Amino acid sequence: MSEGVRIGSLVHTDHRADVLRMLEEGLAQGGTVVTGGAAVEGDGAFMQPTVVTDVAASNLLFQEELFGPVLAVTKFTEEAEALALANDTPFGLLNGVWTNDLSRAHRFARDLQSGMVSINEYPITFPQTAFTGWKQSGIGIEQSQDALRFYTRVKNVNVKL
């Protein structure tokens, strides 16, 4: 990594073990580790940032939420193919779109089947914005006024005075 880049620990050594196990299972289905792929010795539950290329859309690394520093790279040729690949998963927490064409990015973000989309940046959440997933990535909404609505039931009561 470049000087000054910092990456935090995973939440627990058991979680790191789960991520490493899923990485191993995914690699058995195909793919090439370009960098990383191992635990970092010492305090905490650190893991090397890992990039795996040539990952098929059916691969566990493509289909599951690992919640670890693993990037599975899949090639595509057309925008429609990229959208179909992104939506062909049972999960829909977050998608990232990287492009210089913001009109294209917004069109793509509209059609992605996920609760959150980050364009040209690492995902950032604010208390005023909803944190939500689609499909099997969760039920409900956290943060924002939308979250408050999730826990309320509206009732209209009329009284003649």
Which positions does each model-derived feature cover?
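Amidase signature
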Residues: 22-23, 42
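Short secondary-structure junctions
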Residues: 30-37
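Short beta-strand to alpha-helix junction loop
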Residues: 10-20
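Conserved C-terminal structural/oligomerization subdomain of aldehyde/semialdehyde dehydrogenase
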Residues: 7, 39, 46-161
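Short secondary-structure junctions and interdomain/linker hinges
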Residues: 29-30, 158
